[in-house]
């Protein structure tokens, strides 16, 4: 099953997440199909904290991909801000 979820990157104590489309059987930071955005939970005021390609996310949801709870919250916040 294809899912849209977060893959953790960054350094110890400084997380940075990529929003990826991947097979649910793959490891958290393993192989992915497409990167559709990023999320930086510790971004400063000057830095961009979240960027999502909502068109590609809608495409994958139309293809039957499921969305993780955290990514769903990020999408909701992005739609509210837009």
Curated annotation (Swiss-Prot):
Keywords: Ribonucleoprotein, Ribosomal protein
One Gene Ontology biological process: translation
Keyword Ribonucleoprotein carried by entry: yes
GO cellular component: cytoplasm; small ribosomal subunit
Entry GO MF terms: structural constituent of ribosome
InterPro entries in alphabetical order: Ribosomal_bS16, Ribosomal_bS16_CS, Ribosomal_bS16_dom_sf
Similarity section: Belongs to the bacterial ribosomal protein bS16 family.
Protein name: Small ribosomal subunit protein bS16
Organism: Citrobacter koseri (strain ATCC BAA-895 / CDC 4225-83 / SGSC4696)
């Amino acid at each position: 099953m294809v899912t849209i979820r977060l893959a953790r990157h960054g350094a110890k104590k400084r997380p940075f997440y990529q929003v990826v489309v991947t097979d649910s059987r793959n490891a958290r930071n393993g192989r992915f199909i497409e990167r559709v955005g990023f999320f930086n939970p510790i971004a400063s005021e000057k830095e961009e904290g979240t960027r999502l390609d909502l068109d590609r996310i809608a495409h994958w949801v139309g293809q039957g991909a499921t969305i993780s709870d955290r990514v769903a919250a990020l999408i909701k916040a992005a739609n509210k801000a837009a």
